[in-house]
UniProtKB/Swiss-Prot annotation:
Keywords: Cell membrane, Disulfide bond, G-protein coupled receptor, Glycoprotein, Membrane, Olfaction, Receptor, Sensory transduction, Transducer, Transmembrane, Transmembrane helix. The keyword Transmembrane applies. SUPFAM superfamilies: Family A G protein-coupled receptor-like (SSF81321). It is found in: Cell membrane. Disulfide bonds join 99-191. It holds the Pfam family 7tm_4. InterPro entries: GPCR_Rhodpsn, GPCR_Rhodpsn_7TM, Olfact_rcpt, OR51/52/56-like. Belongs to the G-protein coupled receptor 1 family. This is Olfactory receptor 51G1. It is a multi-pass membrane protein. The gene is OR51G1. The chain crosses the membrane at residues 28-48, 57-77, 102-122, 142-162, 199-219, 240-260, 276-296. Odorant receptor. It comes from Homo sapiens (Human).
Length: 321
C-alpha cells in the first residue's frame, strides 16, 4: 500500500490497522466484536433504563452506576466506527482532524471512567462508614457537582493533547498500530522531539489514574477498618458484599490499563497480536462486564431487570392470545 505524505497537516491522513496478516479473516473476526459491541450497548442501556424508570433506585449508588453506564457507552461508541469500518469495509484511512477527535474522546472517557470509579468508592465509604447519613452527605446537588467535576477535569486535561500533536510534522510512516487513534501511537510518528508530549502525558496519567487509584485504595482501607470493627460476622460479610461489584469494576478497569502500559513500554519483543489483544481488552472488557456484574451482584438491579423481562414476556403472550 502506497502512503502519500502530505506536507499540509490539514490534508494529511493516518492509516489504521486491524489484525495484520489476518486480513482475509476480518469478516469472521468482526463477529465476536459485533457481539461485544451489541452486548455493551444493550447492557448499559438496560442499566440506564432501569435506573431512570424506577423511582426507588434514585439514590447515590445508582446515580453513580448510571454515570458509569454512560461513560462505558461513550467509550464503546468512540471506537466502534473505525474498528468495524476496518473489519467490514477495509476503511483504513482517517483524516487527522477525525483522528484527533477520536483520540480526545477515547482519552477523556477513559479518564472519566477512573473519576466515576473514585466517586463510587466515596459512595461505598459513606454507605459503610456513615450509613445513617448517606443521603444527607451525598445529596443530589453534591452528586451533580461530582459528575460535572469528573467531566471538566477529564476534558480540560485531555484537551491540550490534540494541540500538542497538531504542531508536529509527521515524516515517518503514517500507519498506526491499532484500529483507533491513541496519543502514544500518534506521537511516535512525529519527526521532531516528543519530550513535551511524554512529560504532559505522564502528568495527565498522574493527575487522573494516579490520584484516583490512590484515593480508591485509601477509601477501601478505611472501609476495611470499619468492617473489621463490626462485632457480628454476618454484618461484616453484608457490609463487604455491598462493595464487591465496585471492587470488580475497579479491577476490570485498572488491571488491563496497567497491563497495556507495561506491554507498550517493555513488550517490544512480544508478538504484535499481544499488543492488539491488550488494547482491545482495555477498551472493551470493562464496558462489557460492568453491566453484567452489577446486574448479577446488585439485588435491586437484578430484580428490576427480571421484572422488565417478565412484563415483556406477558405482553407477548397477551398479543398471541
Amino acid at each position: 500500500m502506497t502512503i502519500l505524505l502530505n506536507s499540509s497537516l490539514q490534508r494529511a491522513t493516518f492509516f489504521l490497522t486491524g489484525f495484520q496478516g489476518l486480513e482475509g479473516l476480518h469478516g469472521w473476526i468482526s463477529i465476536p466484536f459485533c457481539f461485544i459491541y451489541l452486548t455493551v450497548i444493550l447492557g448499559n442501556l438496560t442499566i440506564l433504563h432501569v435506573i431512570c424508570t424506577d423511582a426507588t433506585l434514585h439514590g447515590p449508588m445508582y446515580y453513580f452506576l448510571g454515570m458509569l453506564a454512560v461513560t462505558d457507552l461513550g467509550l464503546c461508541l468512540s471506537t466502534l466506527p473505525t474498528v468495524l469500518g476496518i473489519f467490514w469495509f477495509d476503511t483504513r484511512e482517517i483524516g487527522i482532524p477525525a483522528c484527533f477527535t477520536q483520540l480526545f474522546f477515547i482519552h477523556t472517557l477513559s479518564s472519566m471512567e477512573s473519576s466515576v470509579l473514585l466517586s463510587m468508592s466515596i459512595d461505598r465509604y459513606v454507605a459503610v462508614c456513615n450509613p445513617l447519613h448517606d443521603s444527607t452527605v451525598l445529596t443530589p446537588a453534591c452528586i451533580v457537582k461530582m459528575g460535572l467535576s469528573s467531566v471538566l477535569r477529564s476534558a480540560l486535561l485531555i484537551l491540550p493533547l490534540p494541540f500538542l500533536l497538531k504542531r508536529f510534522q509527521y515524516c515517518h510512516s503514517h500507519v498506526l498500530a491499532h484500529a483507533y487513534c491513541l496519543h502514544l501511537e500518534i506521537m511516535k510518528l512525529a519527526c521532531s522531539s516528543i519530550i513535551v508530549n511524554h512529560i504532559y502525558g505522564l502528568f495527565v496519567v498522574a493527575c487522573t489514574v494516579g490520584v484516583d487509584s490512590l484515593l480508591i485504595f485509601l477509601s477501601y482501607a478505611l472501609i476495611l477498618r470499619t468492617v473489621l470493627s463490626i462485632a457480628s460476622h454476618q454484618e461484616r460479610l453484608r457490609a463487604l458484599n455491598t462493595c464487591v461489584s465496585h471492587i470488580c469494576a475497579v479491577l476490570l478497569f485498572y488491571i488491563p490499563m496497567i497491563g497495556l502500559s507495561l506491554v507498550h513500554r517493555f513488550g517490544e519483543h512480544l508478538p504484535r497480536v499481544v499488543h492488539l489483544f491488550m488494547s482491545y481488552v482495555y477498551l472493551l472488557v470493562p464496558p462489557l462486564m460492568n453491566p453484567i456484574i452489577y446486574s448479577i451482584k446488585t439485588k435491586q438491579i437484578r430484580q428490576r431487570i427480571i421484572k422488565k423481562f417478565q412484563f415483556i414476556k406477558s405482553l407477548r403472550c397477551f398479543w398471541k392470545d
